[in-house]
Regions:
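Phosphate-handling active-site elements
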Residues: 128-130, 150-166, 269-276, 436-444
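Acidic/His- and Gly-rich active-site-bordering loop/insert found
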Residues: 12-137, 156-161
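Charged, glycine/proline-rich intrinsically disordered loops and linkers
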Residues: 108-124, 176-197, 239-251
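Histidine-centered divalent metal-coordination motifs
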Residues: 101, 211, 237
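Intrinsic-disorder-associated, low-complexity terminal segments enriched in Asp/Asn/His/Tyr and depleted
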Residues: 5-7
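Metal-dependent amide/peptide-bond hydrolase catalytic core
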Residues: 11-25, 73, 106, 228, ...
């Protein structure tokens, strides 16, 4: 089925009968906007950079207990656990997983990626008029608060769903990937989060990953391949007084200087690469971008000799159709074309996926969206489907997954979310759960 098919055809009214409209009203009336704002701020004011999710995990666990749920801690590490709770159905309907991540993108000491790494906007949250401000609000505690409040409303309403509603607040969605001396357990992310939760029982018939898409539908995401590209200088380091100039960049005795030539070529290659590998499907458009995220060479306390080796660390996004070994070969060819002696190491590979059999969930989202907005959801812009999100984990294991939520990604510089959008999201998540979890489950 194509997106056009979904958009053009009449969406069947299944899951909720007309006589149950009063149930919908009962649930939505229980969504308290003030409570939602306070929960989002409480979550946003717990600093939780990747690897330090213990405090927020305890908060979510305690909040769910207070609301009458029976949460579980599912963790690869004792101090970094996922929180899972279930609003049980009667086993006749579809099970829906709601998913958001608790970790945030910036630790205070990360001054070499973000000059203002300790700034409050990355570690706290506050209200300004009709906006909630903060990195954590947008990614991903605001959407999480929305479905937590929706789940509370469903439980308090007394409605009995046919299928389970599974709530998953996870760690490690934002990748800290092991490389060089940076090794687990301190440097390990995605294996501890949604993947661990799913492989330890947090499964349903479909999954809605609540992250910012500006309320557009996305069921494809890019994968990623991380490469360490090392360039070598001369066999014998030269003391500064012995350096000869002029020398062509690629012939410099200093590997750092030689790397400048490769970076120039890599930037040109990246532009061509993203156009050559553009991937379009009903679930979205993947434009695989490339970024040089780190560089190492020499030591700052001893700079009196030329450097024999310099490495760059390159984030290459890949589509569901690509093989990372093909990308590695292209990078090796680039090093050769630069006339450099070097090596290319693939140190992370996480495949991207296009969701399959997503129609029941997609149609439920469309019904809810149309009920709230009076129109069908639009196609989400390409950046929303060109990044890593945990729908990849669900789609990999055969659980049809879609990303759908309020606001935009902080990756583009957005650090504010409208309160109105959060309240709308809570209403939408409640409607979607009522719909999906009241659909008859058919055995695969």
């Amino acid at each position: 089925m194509t997106r056009a098919d979904l958009n053009m055809r009449e969406i069947p009214k299944r899951g909720l009968e007309m006589k149950k409209e009063q149930v919908v009203e009962e649930v939505l009336d229980r969504i308290d906007s003030k409570e939602l704002v306070q929960l989002a701020l409480d979550l946003g004011n717990i600093d939780s950079p990747t690897g330090c999710e213990g405090e927020i995990g305890e908060f979510v666990y305690g909040w769910l207990q207070q609301q009458g749920f029976a949460p579980r801690k599912l963790g690869l590490f004792r101090n970094r656990f996922n929180v899972v709770a279930t609003l049980p159905g009667n086993s006749q309907g579809r099970g829906l997983v709601l998913n958001s991540h608790m970790d945030t993108t910036i630790a205070k000491e990360e001054i070499w990626t973000t000059r203002g790494a300790a700034d409050p906007i990355f570690h706290s949250a506050w209200r300004e008029g009709d906006l909630l401000i903060g990195n954590g609000i947008c990614n991903d505690k605001g959407p999480m608060a929305a479905w937590l409040i929706a789940a509370k409303a469903l439980r308090e309403s007394g409605v009995r769903l046919k299928g389970d509603l599974i709530l998953t607040a996870v760690v490690g969605e934002i990748g800290l990937e092991p490389v060089d001396e940076f090794q687990p357990p301190e440097y390990l992310a995605k294996e501890a989060g949604t993947r661990y939760a799913v492989t330890h029982g947090a499964v349903g018939d479909c999954a809605l990953v609540a992250e910012g898409t500006d309320f557009g539908l996305v069921w494809v995401e890019a994968g990623k391949a991380f490469f360490k590209i090392t360039v070598f200088g001369e066999d014998v380091p030269l003391y500064t007084p012995y350096i000869q100039r002029p020398t062509p960049i690629e012939r410099s005795p200093n590997a750092i200087v030689r790397m400048a030539r490769l970076i120039e070529l890599l930037e040109d290659w990246a532009h061509e690469y993203e156009h050559r590998h553009r991937y379009e499907c009903p679930g979205g458009v993947v434009v695989p971008k490339v970024n040089i995220g780190a560089i190492r060479g020499g030591v700052p306390y001893k700079i009196t000799k030329t450097v024999q080796q310099c490495a760059i660390y390159v984030d290459v996004r890949i589509t569901p159709a690509q093989n990372p070994l093909d990308v590695r070969q292209e990078l090796r060819d680039l090093v050769s074309r630069a006339g450099l002696n070097g090596e290319v190491e693939l140190y992370v590979y996480r495949r991207g996926y296009e969701g399959q059999r997503v129609e029941p969930l997609a149609e439920a989202i469309q019904r809810a969206h149309q009920q709230i907005f009076g129109e069908l959801p639009k196609v989400a812009p390409a950046p929303f489907s060109s990044m890593w999100r945990d729908i990849n984990v669900f789609n990999e294991v055969g659980i049809p997954a879609i990303t759908y939520g309020p606001g935009a990604s902080v990756g583009g510089g957005n650090f504010a979310m409208r309160i109105e959008d959060l309240v709308t999201a809570a209403n939408l998540y409640a409607l979607i759960a009522l719909d999906v979890c009241n659909q008859q489950r058919n055995a695969a």
